A protein has these predicted regions:
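C-terminal and inter-domain tail/linker signature
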Residues: 1-135
């Protein structure tokens, strides 16, 4: 398997685990020094190093806010150990779909990091009861 194929398989396993209703099972793909960086305004935001944080705070709870049954790829680009998934995903309890750009690094069959950016996240912020100034 090439680096690109391996990276594609690991990253796709995350989204498929969510879509199939067993997101926590993705924890087996995490390197123990896995790092996640997400916008600070989210409960799971900031930069966190260590697979335990992602397993306990993200994999165990993300489906409380994001509806993976309404997941789709806008685009999925992989080159060697780097993947960028631009996804559409539902916001739980609403008809809203938001767009998220997720940038992954994978090596030796393990996810090493994810960096996440949300586009127009107002429906998610409303669900989380986070007040946003502006429009």
């Amino acid at each position: 398997m090439t680096f690109t194929e391996e990276t594609r398989a690991v990253v796709d396993a995350y989204y498929q685990a969510g879509a199939e209703g067993h997101l926590p099972s993705f924890g087996t793909y995490l390197d123990e020094r896995f790092s996640v960086t997400a916008p600070n305004y989210l409960p799971w935001g900031g930069t966190h190093v260590g697979a335990d944080f992602f397993r306990e705070q993200v994999l165990e709870h993300l489906t409380e806010t994001l509806d993976f049954s309404r997941f789709s790829y806008e685009s999925f680009t992989v080159e060697r150990t780097h993947a960028v998934a631009l996804i559409n995903i539902g916001v739980v309890g609403t008809d809203d779909i938001i767009k998220i750009s997720e940038h992954w690094e994978v090596r030796d069959g393990k996810a090493k990091s994810i960096w996440v950016a949300y586009f127009e996240p107002q429906p998610l912020l409303k669900l989380l009861a986070i007040v946003v100034s502006g429009n």
